[in-house]
């Protein structure tokens, strides 16, 4: 399509500009190459060298230090992905748009897409051939309506786009929570219990995106979590389980691309959520999967009908891919555990595993319940014996021992476990009983205080729903490291502390986010 | 929402990076401000100073020359729009997303939007508060379905978002072609005829975006077209008409924003087209509007049914806004006139106005027909007398004289009128009759040769549909200035010259684009 013009050869320069996910390149307004594209203002271009092709969005510069007349500046992700040294001559032409964009436009017009079309879209997404705008076009085009077949095709294509793990065991279990509840670090209790029993549970987790901590952030307080595929296999082989960051093993990279656009647009459809979660779990090679859907007024799912529709979608996709999927709804009215933020949550987890008398009972009970479900997948275990077995492994210290083994296998953490040196307490305005806790508000407050960037920032809860409080008694304590974060969190908490006591206070509202 | 942190004050730096329409800012990865946003990778931020607010997309840099630790680098559009000197301290916080985005999400979920919601969206668009992704979300959310009321609200809001011209005359006429046909510079013949008659016709035109020339590009060969509002009024007052670039008078700026995203996504819906054209015409203050819809196998509209649906939409919107709208379909099977490219088209126009014996008859006839329709809007003119009056004004030289007056009023052109010094001819492969011409292919060929950047690049046609040709006789000549463009155009023409002769050649296909 585009025979090379002699002057479309440009020298690679590196531009230290982090453009997130999108490939962005810069050429000089004086450049002899791509005159029409410079004139038009916006365009996509194509870099080619030895069969390697990179599609990128073109920006124009008048600054020679970004790109001189004979140069093309590659921003960080483009430079990393094209992987050629500075100064290399590269052919630059107007981009031939990925063919799969035709299917995206058909979807926008309302047509149902074939498996092959969806496969092509996902393949192009996973290879960073779409601009952010084009990703948005696909997401929004499929946000209003996708068929069951499209959902299956999407999930399958996403699962195949990256690393696909294969395990030698007939039963490989996994658990996943759809998120939204502060604390709630059940995986870090469940994995050692299940692994101590002997079932393989190769757990990958995410880092916090909009919450004050993801499981990977919290585990990082105790051990290294940036673990690659081969190392992961070795750890699971020796310990039956792991607790690592999923981003390092490249499961479902197309999902990461989609999320990078869903998030800024606050798009959140059931189908995308199911395709996202199931594609990662299928790629991770688990055969039996437990999905936890917390339900509560400030949780992601606020009612039983919504939870059931989501459950059926998970079951449908699981069945079609030959995975055993069990979906349970749990109490999502308030945080699980007493800590919010990586260090505080890690403390909760170790207290539960260590059978400390002050360990949060809700985290212990929920973890035992989830572990019980997973243990029942062991054909050798007598039906109904899962809970007793889980409790036995926890109470005996076997789970704690297994956790130490996993921590040793993953390697030492490099994070400080210190709590923020600045703190303030939020106190009850009057006597009464705690009647509601706003999960969204506490999440936001913990982030404002510095979590998860500051591992030791966050919130320690003293009271939960149903607890009696007296006027002036602390409801929770906020930890921060720097005065500005401390002050910002204090003023945010003063504007609304997220607790309703006895009906004297208004119920926290979902719109408070 | 975001009380200022002391360290969220950053010094403005100018980053000479042209990011097109979108506001983009850069901060250092070492910056103490916006730590959470740096960590998340993608976010929107807000710059505030003395009540002025700018929303922008945040990029991160490791290069101190783009932004040091205490600086924020503003890319070109952001720097221009914020309009504060380098070094100014500005408060930078995470952005509060525009409230109207909630309506965009509702639209994506399938809800119909109110007039107020659409008004808020358009207002935010026109003030550059949306990211490119957010604009795409709105466009695609409304691409699948918008109601008549939504279309009216959209058109009205867009018309009100920028300059709104008001004329003292009871009848102000205008014409608009939906485009797609090479050559076809009827406005430059129609405006002088109508103006010579005495009807006001304040014509604004676009520059080429994806075509080899817009009316503004072609007029620029003859006169200055970057004319502001006040000057435009003076010109229309003295000459009854003008032929200027619409981009300089800021009619419907929201439309320009939408087009900047529609174009790279190749989104093209009837409703958006109607809202786009009608909003500009309503803002331009015309009372009587003639819309030209060329129909042909390689035109934008390929059949009568499609043309009729579009016509009804134009009529509907025109009626509701109290404008007289007349829609005519014209022959869109081939280029109008013999030239493609600014200089070649300007030559055609001046030949028609000058009544040269070699002037292209099709351009003359189509222009007379359109002018006739417009002249009939003059209440003083006898019904049915429009065509004769138009011909009289053209044949007598009155139209040419009026054109000279308009050119003098707008001021001299600074462009060269020379044709490209390199050229090649495309010749008939055998004897026969020209049976089809591919408009898309010729448009692309003229662009490849350098138009509209090189005003004198383009194509001169020797044969049109129905003409007899002999083997080896030239069909057209391609002009370019530089060898690379010449060679590229030659190889493109060799791969398919866009002409079908006698049925010996395959009919050009629409997919050839």
Curated annotation (Swiss-Prot), chains A, B:
It catalyses: thymidine + phosphate = 2-deoxy-alpha-D-ribose 1-phosphate + thymine. Keywords: Glycosyltransferase, Transferase. GO terms for biological process: pyrimidine nucleobase metabolic process; pyrimidine nucleoside metabolic process. InterPro entries: Glycosyl_Trfase_fam3, Glycosyl_Trfase_fam3_N_dom, Glycosyl_Trfase_fam3_N_dom_sf, Nuc_phospho_transferase, PYNP-like_C_sf, PYNP_C, Pyrmidine_PPase_CS, Thym_Pase_Put. SUPFAM superfamilies: Nucleoside phosphorylase/phosphoribosyltransferase catalytic domain (SSF52418), Nucleoside phosphorylase/phosphoribosyltransferase N-terminal domain (SSF47648), Pyrimidine nucleoside phosphorylase C-terminal domain (SSF54680). It is an enzyme of class 2 (transferase). GO terms for molecular function: 1,4-alpha-oligoglucan phosphorylase activity; thymidine phosphorylase activity. Its EC number is 2.4.2.4. One of its GO terms (cellular component) is cytosol. The keyword Transmembrane does not apply. It holds the Pfam family Glycos_transf_3. It comes from the Bacteria. NCBIfam families: ARCH_P_rylase, PRK04350.1. Belongs to the thymidine/pyrimidine-nucleoside phosphorylase family. Type 2 subfamily. HAMAP family: Thymid_phosp_2. This is Putative thymidine phosphorylase. It comes from Bradyrhizobium diazoefficiens (strain JCM 10833 / BCRC 13528 / IAM 13628 / NBRC 14792 / USDA 110).
């Amino acid at each position: 399509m585009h025979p090379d013009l002699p002057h479309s050869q440009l020298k690679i320069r590196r531009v230290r500009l982090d453009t997130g996910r999108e490939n962005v390149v810069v050429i000089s307004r004086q450049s002899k190459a791509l005159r029409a594209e410079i004139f038009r203002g916006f365009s996509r271009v194509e870099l080619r060298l030895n069969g390697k092709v990179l599609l990128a969005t073109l920006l124009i510069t008048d600054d020679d230090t970004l790109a001189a007349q004979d140069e093309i500046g590659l921003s960080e992700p483009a430079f990393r992905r094209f992987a050629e040294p500075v100064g290399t001559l590269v052919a630059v032409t107007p981009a031939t748009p990925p063919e799969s964009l035709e299917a995206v436009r058909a979807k926008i017009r309302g047509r149902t897409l074939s498996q092959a079309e969806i496969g092509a879209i996902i393949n192009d997404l996973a290879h960073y051939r779409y601009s952010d705008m084009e990703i948005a076009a696909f997401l929004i085009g499929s946000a209003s309506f996708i068929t069951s077949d499209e959902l299956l095709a999407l999930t399958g294509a996403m699962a195949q786009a990256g690393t696909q793990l294969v395990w030698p065991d007939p039963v490989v279990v996994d658990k996943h929570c759809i998120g939204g509840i502060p604390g709630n670090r059940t995986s870090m209790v469940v994995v050692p219990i299940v692994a101590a029993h002997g079932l393989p549970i190769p757990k990958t987790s995410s880092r916090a995106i909009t919450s004050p901590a993801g499981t990977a952030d919290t585990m990082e307080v105790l051990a290294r979590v940036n673990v690659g595929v081969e190392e992961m296999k070795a750890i699971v082989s020796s310990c039956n389980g792991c607790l690592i960051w999923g981003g390092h093993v490249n499961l479902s990279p197309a999902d990461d691309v989609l999320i990078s656009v869903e998030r800024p647009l606050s798009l959140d459809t059931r189908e995308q959520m199911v395709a996202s979660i199931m594609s990662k779990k299928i790629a991770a090679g688990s055969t039996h999967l437990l999905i936890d859907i917390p339900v509560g007024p400030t949780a992601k799912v606020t009612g039983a009908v919504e939870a059931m529709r989501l459950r059926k979608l998970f079951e449908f996709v699981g069945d079609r891919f030959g995975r055993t999927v069990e979906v349970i709804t749990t109490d999502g009215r308030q945080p699980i555990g007493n800590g919010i933020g990586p260090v505080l949550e890690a403390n909760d987890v170790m207290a539960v595993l260590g059978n400390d008398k002050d360990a949060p009972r809700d985290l212990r009970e929920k973890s035992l319940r989830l572990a019980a479900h997973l243990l029942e997948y062991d054909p050798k275990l007598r039906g109904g014996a899962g809970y007793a077995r889980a409790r036995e492994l926890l109470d005996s210290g076997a789970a704690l021992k297994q956790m130490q083994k996993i921590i040793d296998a993953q390697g030492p953490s490099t994070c400080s476990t210190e709590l923020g040196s600045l703190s303030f307490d939020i106190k009850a305005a009057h006597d009464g009983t705690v009647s509601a806790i706003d999960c969204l508000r506490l999440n936001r407050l913990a982030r404002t205080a510095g979590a998860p960037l500051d591992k030791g920032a966050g919130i320690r809860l003293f009271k939960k729903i149903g607890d009696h409080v007296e006027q002036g008694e602390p409801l929770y304590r906020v930890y921060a490291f720097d005065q500005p974060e401390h002050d910002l969190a204090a003023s945010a908490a003063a504007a609304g502390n997220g607790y309703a006591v006895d009906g004297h206070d208004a119920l926290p509202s979902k719109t408070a986010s």
